[in-house]
Amino acid sequence: MYWGRTSLITIFLLALLSSSAWGGAWCMPKGSLYSKLSYNHYFTVDTFDENGHKRRNPNGSSFRDENITWYNEYGLLDNLTLFASIPHKWLKSRYKFTEGRGLKSTTFTYDGLGDVDLGIRYGLLKEPVVLSLQFLTKVAWFYDSDEAVPPGNNQNDYELKLLLGKSLWPFPGYCGLEMGYRWRTGSPSDEYRYLLEFGMDLIKKFSCRIKLDGIASVKNGDIPKQKPEVNAYIDYDTGQLIKTVSEPSGPGSAFTNPSLGYEYDLGKLEFTLGYACTKSWAFEFTYTNYPYGESIAAGDQYSFGVVYYFSRK
C-alpha cells in the first residue's frame, strides 16, 4: 500500500508542503485535516520598473501588508483534497510628495478580509512520481470596489495547475514542480504560474524548505489609458499663455496598493524553517524575498505559522 509504505514521511511532507494553496502534489489521506494559522508582514519602498530594474519609490513612499491567514486542507478521498485560504488584512499605504519646498505625506489604510481562495486537488498518479491536477478559484466577495487601499483587484479569477512531486526517501526530503494558468476575469492580464521547491529534514524535529514561486504575464490585459497632466500659466513679461504637458508615469503607478498590477512578472524566493512539536502540532518561520519582477512592487515578507494536522490513519 502506498500510504502504508510512506507513513513515516507523510507528516513530514505535509508539514513542509501545505503552507499555501500551492501546497504540493500530495493529496491528503481521506478524513485528514491540515490547518495553518499564519501571521505575515510584508513591507516595501521599492518597485520593479517595466525593464525589471528595482527602483526606490518617489520620496520614499511605502506600503505595508500585515495579514493573518487561515489555510485548510481536508481529504475528502485519498485522491481528492479540498482546500481554502482566508486572509484578514491590515493595509497601510503612505504616499510622500513635495509641496512647495517641503515634503508632505498622506496615509491610506484598509482593515478587513481580502481575496479568498477555494480549490480542489485530484491525485492522478502515486508512482513513480506524484502527479495531481488542481483547480482554484479566487473570489472577491468581502470588500468594495472603492476601498482606499484595495486588498485585491475586486474580481474573481480561476486557475488550473499540474503538480508533480517526488519523495527522495530514504533521503529525508522531496522536490516539486508546478505549472499552471490563471484566467483573470477583469482588466488585469492572465498569468502563467510556475513553482519549484525542495524540502528536507534537518535534525530531529527540524525541517526546511526553499521555494521559487513565479508569475509571468500573458500580456493580454486591458490597461486603462491615463491622461497626461496639463498645466498652464501666464508669463506676465510676454503676456503669453504657457502650457506644459507631462506624460503619465505608467499604468498602475497610482495604486495605493502597489502589490497589484495589470501586466506584471514576479518571482518570490521563500525560505522556511519548521519545528515539529508533536505529530499533530508544528511551527514555521518563513522569509520571502522578491528577487526579480517587472511593473510591480518589490519587497520582503516575514511569516510565522502554527500548524495542526489530524489523520485517521
Q: How would you name each of these model-derived features?
A:
Residues 26, 73, 121-123, 161-167, ...:
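Transmembrane beta-barrel domains of outer membrane proteins
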Residues 33, 66-70, 114-118, 158-162, ...:
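Hydrophobic, lipid-facing positions within transmembrane beta-strands of outer-membrane proteins
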Residues 35-37, 84, 120, 133-135, ...:
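Membrane-embedded beta-strand positions of outer-membrane beta-barrel proteins
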Residues 39-45, 86-92, 124, 137-143, ...:
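Transmembrane beta-strands of outer-membrane beta-barrel pores
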Residues 41-67, 97:
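Surface-exposed strand-loop-strand hairpins of Gram-negative outer-membrane beta-barrel proteins
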Residues 79-84, 127-131, 170-175, 205-210, ...:
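Repeated loop/turn-to-beta-strand initiation elements of outer-membrane beta-barrel proteins
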Residues 93-183, 188-189, 225, 229-262:
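Outer-membrane pore/translocation modules
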Residues 197-313:
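Outer membrane beta-barrel transmembrane domains
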